[in-house]
Amino acid sequence: MQNGANSRSQEYQGVSVDSRYDPQAIETKWQQSWAAAQLDRTPEADDRPKFYALSMFPYPSGNLHMGHVRNYTITDAIARVKRRQGFRVLHPMGWDAFGLPAENAAIDRGVQPADWTYQNVAQMREQLKQLGLSYDWDREVTTCSPDYYRWTQWLFLQFFEAGLAYQKEATVNWDPIDQTVLANEQVDSEGRSWRSGAKVERRQLKQWFLKITDYAEELLQDLDQLTGWPERVRLMQANWIGKSTGAYLEFPIVNSSDRVKVFTTRPDTVYGVSYVVLAPEHPLVTQVTTPEQQTAVAAFAAEVSQTSELERTAEDRPKRGVPTGGFVTNPFTGQAVPIWIADYVLVEYGTGAVMGVPAHDSRDFAFAQRYGLPVQPVIQPTEGAIAEPWPAPFTEAGVMVNSGQFDGLSSTEAKAKIIAFAEEQGWGQAHVQYRLRDWLISRQRYWGCPIPIVHCPDCGPVAAADLPVQLPDSVQFSGRGPSPLAQLEDWVTTTCPSCGKPARRETDTMDTFMCSSWYYLRYSDASNPEIAFTKDKVNDWLPVDQYVGGIEHAILHLLYSRFFTKVLRDRGLLSFDEPFKRLLTQGMVQGLTYKNPKTGKYVPSDRISDPSQPVDPDTGDRLEVFFEKMSKSKYNGVDPARVLDRYGADTARMFILFKAPPEKDLEWDDADVEGQFRFLNRVWRLVQTASQVEATTAADDKAEKDLRRAVHTAIQAVTEDLEEDYQLNTAIAELMKLTNALNDAPMPGSPAYLEGVQTLVLLLAPFAPHIAEELWQQLGGERSVHLEGWPVLDESALIVDEIPLVIQIMGKTRGTITVPASADRDQLQQLAENSEIAQRWLDGQTIRKVIVVPGKLVNFVIASP
């Protein structure tokens, strides 16, 4: 590398240098240069350690928002640092391109979903390139491309062959006007269709599921391996899996040979059962309902069937029920207890039946209070008894009472003994249950990956022979009736791959999470036309070393991806247990928001005439002002294109990375954006100066050492900030400190000064790649700054020869002197006593005591007059 004063006139990779900081021109120039040089292409396997940096890929809506910019900039900075630290890096990008918005566009605008999607992909790809993100575009994947979804279908068949994909009846949202199935997001808060306005009905439909419950225990236990994940995310997944240890208990139905089977985590409370509840959909409801209760039970069941699962299980919603008139016998007490149906019991969860113990469960207590059901205490506190009637349920551990042979035991001990007794008597057995349910992947949509199954009257569901099963082109969309695929008779009609007889294709498509549950695997071998990925390549690059994405994906996407990985491992397709070593959930980008507290309406900032005293221009009401997540509905978003047009991508990146730690929410502030632009201009001017000065020999050895110490302190601090927790904001703060030190340097052109300027540019490059590339050329760089090694710390430069020593008299600071860093206690005391400060303040005084704190201060204690 050269220091050359004439570097401005140099040509670097055929690109000329401008003496004025023009971000738009610089960024366009270098983006074109990097693309031509394939600077970001992923290297083949070699002896270097690998690093796989991955951002969650976006849905191609057509425009980037600031949340995207933050996610991708964080990951890009990490990838750029790792490349220069000697890693071979995989840093890809793609598109989660199936989904409902494209189908809605087809209905509303008359465009084909594929055309709408690919147009958006092209637009967003260009926006990403404008940010200077170092993606290997040769590995781009688009989930709606047949080249991709043929492998999604192939993976589905892996599940099918393993017995992990199956069909069963499940409830869907049905629009009675449009005669079509609705996704949950198409149903408003009042339970109406967003398009027709009809009251949505709940119907049973045969659907495809994946047996994720077969992996529930492993998914739970392996969370302990994920030490690089936020504890919050691991806890969310553990709660979603929801392991419960307890028992199945069976209650014989009076006048029947059948039994009601319940699961309970509190078998110690079984003597306190005062009723049993079935889900309205439970298959035994008809049998246990008496003629007198048939009308009431049928009406209640019909009403509940139109209520969403979320509503039925909401904590703050009163629990409602109806007695069936039937009874079961509590086998432990021999007493008959009534059977009810209630809205809060779901047939899909557990056995679809629960035992009601009002004395020891809050929900049961509220239900019993509402319907006048008896409360029978069977556990008392260890110390002191609760007087009846009980004012509230006692839900903690205690001593067994009213429980026959188990009286006097601790409730904890009684659990095991009651389960053992039930097993001996044939009334129940120990059982572990999970809240997690099998994954419903069927969607009655066109714009999704077709499920590659053929339904044969003789053979049943059979795997399609030829993949991909492609979506038909030029489909007409009305938003009414069955799935568009189901209406295409020519497409549906086929022959059975097994027996050759007439058969029909599956017309459901897959949940889009199917496509995103394995895309990170495809990146390892993205262009392979013969297989989804080779075992060698996927085992080479995976697991992902750093995954970056929003907390909103903490459960479904991440859990499904973990499930996919484990199934494919068991199928022999890969050799690791978990897909993502480390996870960073970046905070939200928040915008300044104006809201009328009286009307609840949001007001756009461009309608505010006086930001210091904002009022609603329509009503004159004083507005509330606060920061909230950017969204169109709140009029608080900032268009990335506007920021790039005004300041350039490097300024946007610097602001995004500096404003807040990656995991914290970021409040958008135009003034701070301007501040980053000014900082980059300062760096620009600094390098202009450095590129013109002649190299000199330092005359002031102390100043040179101090400056070199500042340079290597910056190297140390920035490197540490970029390890493990990626504190990118404090790393940029260190660059600002170094810039100040260089601007204050007494001798521009000295070796330490020139080393410092070069180091500043090298450290700046991951954050602001375009300006760093331009400045590196001005400093005489012979190749791209992004190919240069990471600056190496010289620990000897951090050694301090002299340190400040505070002089105190009676604990009050009177001044500071400079002393050798190696001085011992006696030397420090002597230097302090001989200082001008001490001479002035101690003149005529008697020193009673001297306190020396090495490296910090000397305190003189004087005798009282």
Curated annotation (Swiss-Prot):
- Cytoplasm: is it a keyword of this entry? yes
> Which keywords has UniProt assigned to this entry?
Aminoacyl-tRNA synthetase, ATP-binding, Cytoplasm, Ligase, Nucleotide-binding, Protein biosynthesis
Q: Could you confirm whether the keyword Cell cycle appears in this record?
A: no
Q: Where is this motif: 'HIGH' region?
A: 58-68
Signal peptide positions (record): none
> Residue ranges for motif 'KMSKS' region?
629-633
Pfam families in alphabetical order: Anticodon_1, tRNA-synt_1, tRNA-synt_1_2, tRNA-synt_1g
Q: Which domain of life is it from?
A: Bacteria
Which biological processes are named by the entry's GO terms? leucyl-tRNA aminoacylation
Q: Which residues form a coiled coil?
A: none
Entry-linked Gene3D superfamilies: HUPs (3.40.50.620), Isoleucyl-tRNA Synthetase, Domain 1 (1.10.730.10)
> Where is the protein found, in the record's own terms?
Cytoplasm
Which reaction(s) does the protein catalyse, per the Swiss-Prot or TrEMBL entry?
tRNA(Leu) + L-leucine + ATP = L-leucyl-tRNA(Leu) + AMP + diphosphate
InterPro entries xrefs:
aa-tRNA-synth_I_CS, aa-tRNA-synth_Ia, Leu-tRNA-ligase, Leu_tRNA-synth_edit, M/V/L/I-tRNA-synth_anticd-bd, Methionyl/Leucyl_tRNA_Synth, Rossmann-like_a/b/a_fold, tRNAsynth_Ia_anticodon-bd
Molecular function, one GO term: leucine-tRNA ligase activity
Q: Write out the GO cellular component annotations.
A: cytosol
* UniProt cross-references to CDD domains, sorted A to Z: Anticodon_Ia_Leu_BEm, LeuRS_core
Q: Where does ATP bind?
A: 632
What EC designation does it have? 6.1.1.4
The family this protein is said to belong to: Belongs to the class-I aminoacyl-tRNA synthetase family.
Q: Which PANTHER family match?
A: LEUCINE--TRNA LIGASE, MITOCHONDRIAL, LEUCYL-TRNA SYNTHETASE
Concerning HAMAP family, the annotation shows: Leu_tRNA_synth_B (MF_00049_B)
Q: What is this protein called?
A: Leucine--tRNA ligase
Report the source organism: Synechococcus elongatus (strain ATCC 33912 / PCC 7942 / FACHB-805) (Anacystis nidulans R2)
